[in-house]
Amino acid sequence: SGAFIGSSYTFATARDWARFGQLYLQDGEWNGERILPEGWVAYTRTLTPHGVANLGYGAQFWLNTGGENRRWPNLPEDLYAMNGHQGQHVFIAPSHDAVIVRVGLSEFDNWRMSDFAADVLAALPAPAAGAGP
């Protein structure tokens, strides 16, 4: 409350962004201690009341909802992400127990974070049956 801009101007290292993503992947717990309120991560992963599924926006996170029309069709439907200015991304994929961070400026049109993330997820061991939320 009282925040002029709640969506921007957060500066951190790639490692700190990865930790932040890991905190969300772990449902708001860190080293056995609850940091975020119970249910907060589920709330952030819920489509906003007037949201359109394939535009997929939750509470400050982009969602990969909408079935075949989802934002990143080549990525898991449970994936959610923070996308920042000039190519800053934190992708969280619960079904793969993975956080993917990219910080950097992309000045060429053919860079696609979703393709990069799909390649990273494909290189990881297959998710265990029943993995994810």
Each predicted region: which residue ranges?
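Structural helix-adjacent loops and short alpha-helical linkers that scaffold large soluble proteins
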Residues: 28-37, 111
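Non-transmembrane alpha-helical segments in soluble domains
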Residues: 18-25, 41, 45, 62, ...
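Sec/Tat-exported extracytoplasmic proteins
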Residues: 21-28, 48, 65, 103, ...
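Structured C-terminal helix/loop/strand segments within mature extracytoplasmic catalytic/sensor domains
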Residues: 79-133
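Active-site helix/loop module of the DD-peptidase/beta-lactamase fold
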Residues: 1-7, 12, 39
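Active-site-proximal alpha-helical segments within enzyme catalytic domains
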Residues: 8-29, 88-104
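Short, conserved, surface-exposed binding loops centered on an aromatic residue
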Residues: 9-13, 33, 51-53
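Active-site Gly/Thr loop motif
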Residues: 45-99
